[in-house]
């Protein structure tokens, strides 16, 4: 079955058609590392991780490049505020970002280039644009792209030049010929990082950075480019223009990239979460409160193109759902131990993959899994001894769920280990000490062995009053935070 995506360039859902059959060259815009990653960044890279995982599961050879913007106005400002070297500041936040992405279960990209390591390639690309007449050097040492020289400008963002001109302005100190033009190279200023160039010392503009790194690590044209909806204009619009002008046909967006995908924002009270608005939560702080896999499940519960509302209550619900998944798997694993799965798989896995083929519809996959978990629990909880066929069906369920979980990045831990971790996070949020709960469970077990059921019930009720529910099963007593 073909994979269909919502392509921002055409404004339609259409089949993903790689330039070279069976291979996908994919570039996702990475973070500007001037601060800790926030919850919105986590959503972005879980989305692209899902895209890469599913494409590979469907047999595509994917080369995934995601950059670090470590040369930028925001980095310079933050370093100045903190009296810190901007290179060191960016390197520290890049390391922290990688740690956060690892915690979320994201695969590392094949290449994670940094702007600071690609300045010669950037200078070469700008030189090519100047030579071809798409860019010009100003007297002050800046270099600008001439927007009107590229006929397909604004197609991605569905904006024409007249609309853009009405909102354009020339900032003080800029030497552009046309308010629509944008900087490819910025002349050196005191206290800023500087590199040599044919136009004098300076540093790259934001947009040219991604174009040069795409060319360096994927070549042009590429098959797929991704980012948040806030990048459609101006960043991706400008990327298309300068890339197609420098190494494409100079006329069409497709000569740089064939397909474009953009995800929705994480919102708080219907407003985009962002550092500039000051309404953000760092990913690191959220991962300290909630199980990382639960946070991943939270992201996957909303289609990537739609906005997703953030709150602690919604995250806690995602964590409870994950707890249910692992409780079911723990129960099923015990019942199906030593049993070969029935059949060769299919149903659940193929239904899930078909949902992902349709514009990476993760919420539909979770709906498929919800039905499978309901059926598995009904079978596992059925009274009476399990038949060999029952155990084989349960084994098949566990196999299939874990198989599709490799694409979602979910349910890959041992259930007992996952449940301990989830309980510990939930308990910590309520000020409950897991060790004291475990001690009470031991005390209750001793009371039950002594047939002191009044004491046993009192312990259970006291824990429940604290928000801890006990569950007795064949494997012993477990607990969860209500």
From Swiss-Prot:
A motif ('KMSKS' region) lies at residues 272-276. It comes from the Bacteria. Its main location: cytoplasm. Coiled coil: none annotated. Its EC number is 6.1.1.16. The keyword ATP-binding applies. ATP binds at residue 275. GO terms for cellular component: cytosol. PANTHER family: CYSTEINE--TRNA LIGASE, CYTOPLASMIC, CYSTEINYL-TRNA SYNTHETASE. This is Cysteine--tRNA ligase. It comes from Anaeromyxobacter sp. (strain Fw109-5). The lineage of its organism: Bacteria, Pseudomonadati, Myxococcota, Myxococcia, Myxococcales.
């Amino acid at each position: 079955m073909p994979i269909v995506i919502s392509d921002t360039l055409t404004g339609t859902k259409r089949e993903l058609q790689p330039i070279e059959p069976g291979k996908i060259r994919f570039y996702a815009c990475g973070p500007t590392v001037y601060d800790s990653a926030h919850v919105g960044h986590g959503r972005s890279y879980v989305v692209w991780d899902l895209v890469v995982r599913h494409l590979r599961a469907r047999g595509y050879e994917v080369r995934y490049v995601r950059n670090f913007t470590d040369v930028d106005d925001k980095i310079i400002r933050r370093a100045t505020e903190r009296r810190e070297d901007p290179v060191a500041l960016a390197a520290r936040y890049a390391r922290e970002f990688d740690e956060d992405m690892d915690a979320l279960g994201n695969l590392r990209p094949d290449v994670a280039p940094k702007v600071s390591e690609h300045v010669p390639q950037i200078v070469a690309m700008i030189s090519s644009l100047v030579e071809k007449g798409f860019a010009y050097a100003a007297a002050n040492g800046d270099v600008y792209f001439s927007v009107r020289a590229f006929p397909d400008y604004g197609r991605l963002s569905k904006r024409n030049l007249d609309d853009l001109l009405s909102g354009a302005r020339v900032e003080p100190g800029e030497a552009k010929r046309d308010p629509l033009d944008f900087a490819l190279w910025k002349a050196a200023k005191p206290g800023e990082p500087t590199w040599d160039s044919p136009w004098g010392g300076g540093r790259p503009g934001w947009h040219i950075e991604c174009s040069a790194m795409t060319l360096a690590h994927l070549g042009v044209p590429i098959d797929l480019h991704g980012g948040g909806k806030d990048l459609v204009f101006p960043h991706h619009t400008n990327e298309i223009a300068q890339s197609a002008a420098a190494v494409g046909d100079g006329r069409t967006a497709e000569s740089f990239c064939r397909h474009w995908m953009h995800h929705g924002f994480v919102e708080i009270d219907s407003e985009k979460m962002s550092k500039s608005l000051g309404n953000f939560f760092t990913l690191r702080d959220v991962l300290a409160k909630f199980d990382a896999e639960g946070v991943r499940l939270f992201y996957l519960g909303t289609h990537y193109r739609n906005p997703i509302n953030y709150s602690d209550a919604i995250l806690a619900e995602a964590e409870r759902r994950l707890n249910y998944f692992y409780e079911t798997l723990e129960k099923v694993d015990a019942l199906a131990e030593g049993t070969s799965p029935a059949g060769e798989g299919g149903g659940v896995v193929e239904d899930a993959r078909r949902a992902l083929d349709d514009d990476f519809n993760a919420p539909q996959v979770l709906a498929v899994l919800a039905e499978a978990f309901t059926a598995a629990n009904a079978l596992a909880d059925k009274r009476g001894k399990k038949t060999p066929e029952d155990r084989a069906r349960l084994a098949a369920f566990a196999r299939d769920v874990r198989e599709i979980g490799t694409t979602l990045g979910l349910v890959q831990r041992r259930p007992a280990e996952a449940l301990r971790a989830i309980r510990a996070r939930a308990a910590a949020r309520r000020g409950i000490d897991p060790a004291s709960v475990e001690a009470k469970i031991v005390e209750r077990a001793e009371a039950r062995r002594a047939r002191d059921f009044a004491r046993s019930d009192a312990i259970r009720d006291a824990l429940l009053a604290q928000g801890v529910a006990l569950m007795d099963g064949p494997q012993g007593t477990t607990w969860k935070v209500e």
